[in-house]
């Protein structure tokens, strides 16, 4: 039986931003704005950036757009933060190709979502992720479980079976429950770095063994999130809880409708006009935008 090496507690840092994809008024990717936004997010506390994930609207980006975004963001941050590429697909061959391409392009890691729509059984999920891992053996991978989007969930037992793939080093937990973190910790221990995939559950997930977060809210309150994480790991639990409670209204507002619709509107409100989402997503309705503005204004006063 192979010996699986231990990994560092947070291989990509503790605060990762699932970065939006900026579009111009014609709906084309605004690569220059993506570069500026990437540098801003790092300045606001992000240890890593994930391009072309759910928040980055990967379903409506071509593979060529995704590869160019990866290159753009990597060049923009110039080693000051980890850059991960979303390379998941419900086609194993597509995921293999995209992950290998990300490795060739110099990504620091890849976010690989559970295959969506076709609902493979657990054996199929194991085979899928094993094949992707073997296609880019030197690229660290983060598995991504978000059953509300994919219609399918990878079980902790299946993840445990994948632990002999040495480059599967982390897991984005977005099932909406802390139980997933506990079950993974029991089965995989410190071998697997678990990241909260839900801003609102970050503090509870840290308390049961998560190492950090893949955040949407960090587009708006990166330094506040960083402060909460640092307070928690410094043992300042009351301070961490205070941050958690103060940020809850924003967390809820950013998921009042489908992500990334609200966060794109929020970015515009704070001076980053990143464009509307691509169809079939729509811009945030005016009433919800007004409520979002009130939430952000109130938060900035605390």
Swiss-Prot record:
> Which family, according to UniProt?
Belongs to the DapA family.
According to UniProt, the name of this protein is 4-hydroxy-tetrahydrodipicolinate synthase
Which residues of this protein are annotated with the site description Part of a proton relay during catalysis? Answer: 54, 117
* Catalytic reaction equation(s): L-aspartate 4-semialdehyde + pyruvate = (2S,4S)-4-hydroxy-2,3,4,5-tetrahydrodipicolinate + H2O + H(+)
Extract the InterPro entries matched here: Aldolase_TIM, DapA, DapA-like, Schiff_base-form_aldolases_AS, Schiff_base-form_aldolases_CS
The GO terms this record gives for MF are: 4-hydroxy-tetrahydrodipicolinate synthase activity
* UniProt-listed Enzyme Commission number(s): 4.3.3.7
What is one term from the GO cellular component aspect held by the record? cytosol
Mind telling me which SUPFAM superfamilies this protein's record contains? Aldolase (SSF51569)
Main function:
Catalyzes the condensation of (S)-aspartate-beta-semialdehyde [(S)-ASA] and pyruvate to 4-hydroxy-tetrahydrodipicolinate (HTPA).
Whose protein is this, by species? Prochlorococcus marinus (strain SARG / CCMP1375 / SS120)
* Sorted UniProt keywords: Amino-acid biosynthesis, Cytoplasm, Diaminopimelate biosynthesis, Lyase, Lysine biosynthesis, Schiff base
Protein location: Cytoplasm
Pathway entry: Amino-acid biosynthesis; L-lysine biosynthesis via DAP pathway; (S)-tetrahydrodipicolinate from L-aspartate: step 3/4
Please tell me where this protein is predominantly located: cytoplasm
**Where is pyruvate annotated to bind?**
55, 214
The top EC class is: lyase
Task: Describe its partners and assembly state.
Answer: Homotetramer; dimer of dimers.
What is one Gene Ontology biological process annotated in the Swiss-Prot or TrEMBL record?
lysine biosynthetic process via diaminopimelate
The active-site annotation reads: 144, 172
């Amino acid at each position: 039986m192979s010996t699986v090496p231990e990994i560092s507690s947070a291989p990509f840092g503790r605060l990762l931003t699932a970065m939006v994809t900026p579009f111009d008024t014609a709906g084309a990717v605004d690569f220059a704005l993506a570069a500026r936004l990437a540098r801003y997010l790092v300045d606001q506390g992000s240890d890593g950036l994930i391009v072309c994930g759910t928040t980055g609207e990967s379903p409506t980006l071509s593979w060529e757009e995704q590869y160019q975004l990866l290159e753009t963001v990597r060049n923009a941050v110039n080693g000051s933060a980890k850059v991960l590429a979303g390379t998941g697909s419900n086609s194993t061959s597509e995921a293999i190709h995209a992950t290998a391409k990300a490795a060739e392009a110099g990504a620091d890691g890849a976010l690989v979502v559970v295959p969506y729509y076709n609902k493979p059984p657990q054996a199929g999920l194991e085979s899928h992720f094993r094949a992707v891992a073997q296609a880019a053996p030197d690229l660290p991978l983060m598995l991504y479980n978000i059953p509300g989007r994919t219609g399918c969930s990878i079980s902790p037992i299946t993840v445990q079976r994948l632990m002999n793939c040495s480059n599967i080093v982390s897991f984005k937990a977005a099932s909406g429950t802390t139980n997933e973190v506990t079950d993974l910790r029991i089965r995989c221990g410190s071998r697997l770095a678990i990241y909260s995939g839900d801003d609102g559950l970050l503090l509870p997930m840290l308390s049961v063994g998560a190492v950090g977060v893949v955040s949407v809210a960090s587009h708006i309150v990166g330094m506040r999130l960083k402060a909460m994480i640092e307070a928690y790991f410094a043992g300042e639990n009351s301070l961490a809880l205070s941050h958690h409670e103060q940020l809850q209204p924003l967390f809820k507002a950013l998921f009042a409708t489908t992500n990334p619709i609200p966060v794109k509107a929020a970015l515009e409100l704070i001076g980053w006009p990143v464009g509307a989402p691509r169809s079939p997503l729509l811009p945030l309705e005016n009433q919800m935008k007004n409520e979002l503005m009130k939430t952000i204004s109130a938060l900035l006063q605390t």
